[in-house]
UniProtKB/Swiss-Prot annotation:
Domain of life: Eukaryota
Name of the protein in question: Immunoglobulin heavy variable 1-3
InterPro entries: Ig-like_dom, Ig-like_dom_sf, Ig-like_fold, Ig_V-set, IgHV
Region entry Framework-2, spans: 53-69
Length: 117
């Protein structure tokens, strides 16, 4: 295990030790090229509107890749240049849920997608 993974583990362990924050994502999906996918992330254990929600992905054999984030309070968004025009991040404050929609899917979009507070 290299130092970067140790740091990530320690941060995750410290966060989990002091809270009951939970982020529950929708399940796996299979899509055809050119289609769109919308992933949900339901938050609990904290005030949803007080934090930003980030979306990252990890393709097979690749590093984590940041896609964008949303300010859950005011709805402002910022996207990675790489995904600009294809990704849309939204939120429903009444349901404490964030959404990430990726359009014009291609084979290179095969990945595990994560939300992160």
């Amino acid at each position: 295990m290299d130092w970067t993974w140790r740091i990530l583990f320690l941060v995750a362990a410290a966060t989990g030790a002091h809270s009951q924050v939970q982020l529950v994502q929708s399940g796996a999906e299979v899509k055809k090229p050119g289609a769109s996918v919308k992933v949900s992330c339901k938050a609990s254990g904290y005030t949803f509107t007080s934090y930003a929600m980030h979306w990252v992905r990890q393709a097979p054999g690749q590093r984590l890749e940041w896609m964008g984030w949303i300010n859950a309070g005011n709805g402002n968004t910022k996207y990675s240049q790489k995904f600009q025009g294809r990704v849309t991040i939204t939120r429903d404050t009444s349901a404490s849920t964030a959404y990430m929609e990726l359009s014009s899917l291609r084979s290179e979009d095969t990945a595990v997608y994560y939300c992160a507070r």
